């Protein structure tokens, strides 16, 4: 059965609706990135779905289309701030900043997952990146943005293979940590080895 990815956007059809998602909650290194997207219901880009279900090439293509056609914003919270305030609070902060940075003020903000926000505009949707087009679009922007950041950091610290693992705790990444120790970009609050 085909899921109507505009179901939630249609539910709030008289409102400006933003979708928000993050990338980088689980990695051992690098920032967490949140992106907010307001989809233009009169200009639907085909192929948008949860970033994890797309090839890198398709994500990059959709990134260009989304950023060229929709209102969007991104927020990045550093690994040091993640260590200072914890990953959940860092993610919430990134989400709030991304929404605040949009060129249009949304009346409803659809959020992937079950995070709770004090802002009453935020509506949490479990599995939202598979159920809402605007959340799926935000997942693509967040993932591509973070992957590009980790690619840049990988040039500085190639031994951790961030160009391949994006900072996640793969076997090779953990082996590199055991050999080389932690880089300045590793999250100290994450127990990895």
Curated annotation (Swiss-Prot):
Its cofactor is Mn(2+); Mg(2+). GO terms for cellular component: cytoplasm; ribonuclease H2 complex. InterPro entries: RNase_HII, RNase_HII/HIII, RNase_HII/HIII_dom, RNaseH-like_sf, RNaseH_sf. SUPFAM superfamilies: Ribonuclease H-like. Keywords: Cytoplasm, Endonuclease, Hydrolase, Manganese, Metal-binding, Nuclease. One of its GO terms (molecular function) is RNA binding. GO terms for biological process: DNA replication, removal of RNA primer; mismatch repair. A divalent metal cation binds at residues 21-22, 112. It holds the Pfam family RNase_HII. Residues 15-193 form the RNase H type-2 domain. Manganese or magnesium. Binds 1 divalent metal ion per monomer in the absence of substrate. May bind a second metal ion after substrate binding. It catalyses: Endonucleolytic cleavage to 5'-phosphomonoester. It is an enzyme of class 3 (hydrolase). The keyword Manganese applies. It is found in: Cytoplasm. The keyword Hydrolase applies. Its EC number is 3.1.26.4. Belongs to the RNase HII family. Endonuclease that specifically degrades the RNA of RNA-DNA hybrids. This is Ribonuclease HII. The gene is rnhB.
